[in-house]
Amino acid sequence: MKLLPFISCKCITYGRVDTLVEALHSFLIQEYPVDRCELIIVNDYPKQKLIFDHPQVTIYNLDETFPLIGEKENYAIERCNGDLIAVWDDDDVAMSNHLMNIANHWKDDTNIIHWETGVFYNEPNITSITGVGNSGIVYSKDAWERIGRSPLENAGGDMTLTNRIHALGGVVNAKMPDSEASWFYMWGGRGYHQSGMGTDDESKPNIIQRHSEWIESLRVKGEVPTGDIHLVPAWQKPYDKMLENYVKNKSSIN
């Protein structure tokens, strides 16, 4: 039997505990061998120290904020032990079969996976099952090394990264029955969203500055906790049941 790939779920975060605990829960429910996966969380919001004791979860709390998302990405990936890097954003959600979906779609010549069958969730409901672009991509650590690591950019860096990996070949657009979809791309009412912001330019503060200002405004209003924070993994909603019902209703309509 072929050995399953070691998958490092890479999560970078800044002041979004309410959604981070959903991402954490999503990792903990994975139906995947515990010795073949890990979750790496990098937190560079100095006003928070995130705490969660689990053998598969490692949290790095930093005293200074990275000036570039690309630097933060590289810091996180350098600390990943897996052959595969699964983007595990702090505001998205995965079903329990997600890591197994990665393993099933990854071939010897694969460099990157995109989810052609993904779940687009626009608060408060699932909107569609469709391709989700660069959300939840999975790439090999080897490919990351071969392209010179993550680009030292802010907004738009994910597009630069994927374009460089695509140039290597080995691109998989993973399709599966709707009932097997496992990655939720979450939108609507879930905080400051980098996606859709385009690339940074001199006409406005960069994405790091804008997000920091947004989190600070929430902290002042008492909506962002500070200090030592013991993470309690949980979903806000039964997303698995929501997906099941969505697929069932879609089938009955068709």
Spans of features found by a protein language model:
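N-proximal low-complexity "stem/linker" segments adjacent to membrane-targeting elements
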Residues: 1-26
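Short, acidic, metal-binding catalytic loop of nucleotide-sugar glycosyltransferases
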Residues: 22-36
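Glycine-rich, basic loop-to-helix element that forms the pyrophosphate-binding segment
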Residues: 63-80
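Short aromatic/hydrophobic "clamp" motif used to bind/position activated sugar donors
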Residues: 85
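Acidic donor-binding/catalytic loop of UDP-sugar-dependent glycosyltransferases
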Residues: 92-105
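Short beta-strand-to-loop element that shapes/binds the nucleotide-sugar donor at the catalytic cleft/hinge
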Residues: 113-127
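Acidic donor-binding loop at a coil-to-helix junction in glycosyltransferase catalytic cores
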Residues: 154-161
